[in-house]
Design a protein with these regions (language model features):
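Bacterial N-terminal signal peptides
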Residues: 1-11
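Extracellular, repeat-based ectodomains that mediate carbohydrate processing or recognition
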Residues: 15-430
Length: 430
């Protein structure tokens, strides 16, 4: 555990809309904070997990990046100093954190370490004070993009290796795992995990993007939802949508597929399955955000619905979705609709791009939606945050959760480009 260190409490100079709090920076204020994951329990505690790029005070054996845990005991009003999750002596990547929806108490976390060749699971039953650790899967090959889902004694850790999607399943609360291949008939290109969830009946679901061209995240993208009703032993997948090739973001130093099609899942208390994803119709062109739902375990899905009010041509990415009781579904994403009026006369392809985080909610399963709320706002003192928005998303995903009071919490990354500098921010509201 870290000793006393400075951690950020900077808040927005301009007040956020009344439905959401002003954004506050969380985590260490030195180095870079990247792609956070978020969870909330039934007692007012909020948990955020993120990889920290830079020196960690008080931890001589920490490598870059190091997985840091943030805990709030008062529904996000204040945060404890960041603490090191596990001193492994290797870099730690791709944070995942979840609270068991069956008891709303037990906390699980996961990440990659040992040169991304181990998938680590952590479990806590005392509000994150102490943890037990298990290596769920170990391999000679490099893994990517773990997705964590839990319910009761069922724990699923999905991950991908090039074109293959795998899952490690446990039926004893994460103590022992059995791996299984999910997509036996994969496409030639990479498969990238997006999300995992377990419904109230115990069915497990995974969502991933699969690229058509060999050797990377290239070509058109199939978006899949896979289902297992036998504790992860076998899987059946359905194509939810097909997207054109991913937009190019080499100017921001990002890797292949960073802004490509992505899909996220949630299940409500009545077993309704919800999906939110980004997809485009023109190769390397802008993508938008779509929503659909299924009331029969993913067998049939309603026609997709565009849920962003941004004008055509606006780039969208990084869908996030959570669901509560019957019909309660909440969604968020990032897009580039904001522009600088000073550049109005310049060619469109030469104007600076600005990103913001947006949120909507529905109380009737997506039949109707609330107005959009811009969650991210200007904060002075950061070279990558302007009055129009932040310069680039900082992380492959961001986190969202519903707390014990029914409020939504969002934690996301803002940066200058894909590399550095960047930080993570928290806001909450309805």
């Amino acid at each position: 555990m870290l000793g006393p260190v400075a951690f950020a409490l900077a808040s927005a100079a301009w007040a956020a809309p009344p439905q959401f709090s002003a954004q506050k920076r969380v985590g260490l204020t030195t180095g870079d904070q990247w792609e956070p994951s978020l969870a909330a329990d039934g007692s007012g505690r909020i948990y955020a997990l993120y990889p920290h790029y830079g020196e960690v005070p008080g931890c001589k054996d920490c490598r870059i990046p190091t997985m840091l845990l943030l805990i709030s005991n008062d529904d996000g009003k204040t945060w404890q100093p960041p603490r090191v999750m596990f001193e492994s002596g290797s870099g730690q990547f791709d944070a995942q954190i979840a609270v068991d929806p069956a008891d709303r108490h037990t906390v699980f976390a996961a990440w990659l370490e040992n040169r991304k060749r181990e998938v680590m699971l952590a479990r806590s039953s005392d509000f994150g004070a102490t943890w037990s650790f298990t290596v769920a899967v170990r391999s000679d090959e490099e893994f990517d993009k773990p997705a964590l889902a839990v319910r009761g004694q069922n724990v699923y850790l999905a991950f991908n290796h090039e074109e293959e999607v795998w899952v490690a399943a446990s039926q004893d609360g994460g103590r022992n795992f059995t791996p299984a291949r999910v997509n036996a008939d994969s496409r030639p290109g990479w498969s990238l995990l997006g999300s995992a969830v377990v419904d109230p009946s115990g069915n497990a679901y995974l969502a991933w993007a699969s690229y058509s061209k060999a050797g990377g995240a290239r070509g058109s993208v199939n978006l899949y939802v896979g289902k297992s009703s036998d504790s992860g032993k076998t899987w059946a997948a359905k194509t939810i949508d097909v997207s054109a090739a991913a937009p190019d973001c080499k100017d921001e130093d990002c890797g292949e597929g960073y802004l490509g099609a992505q899909i996220s899942l949630a299940s409500s208390s009545d077993g309704t399955l919800y999906a939110l994803w980004s997809a485009g119709r023109t190769a390397m062109g802008p993508e938008t955000i779509y929503f659909s739902s299924s009331t029969n375990g993913g067998e049939n899905w309603l026609p997709r619905e565009s849920v962003s009010s941004a004008q055509p041509g606006v780039e969208h990415a990084f869908p996030a979705i959570v669901a509560g009781h019957n019909g309660d579904v909440r969604i968020a994403w990032m897009d580039t609709r904001m522009t600088d009026p000073k550049t109005a006369g310049e060619p469109e392809d030469s104007r600076p791009t600005y990103w913001n985080t947006y949120y909507r909610s529905s109380s009737n399963g997506g039949a109707t939606w609330s107005d959009e709320i811009q969650v991210s706002h200007y904060v002075p003192g950061f070279s990558y945050i302007t009055e129009q928005g932040f310069r680039f998303p900082f992380g492959d995903y961001f986190g969202m959760a519903i707390d014990n009071l029914g409020d939504t919490h969002i934690v996301w990354g803002e940066g200058l480009n894909y590399q550095s500098p960047g930080s993570i921010w928290h806001a909450s509201g309805r």
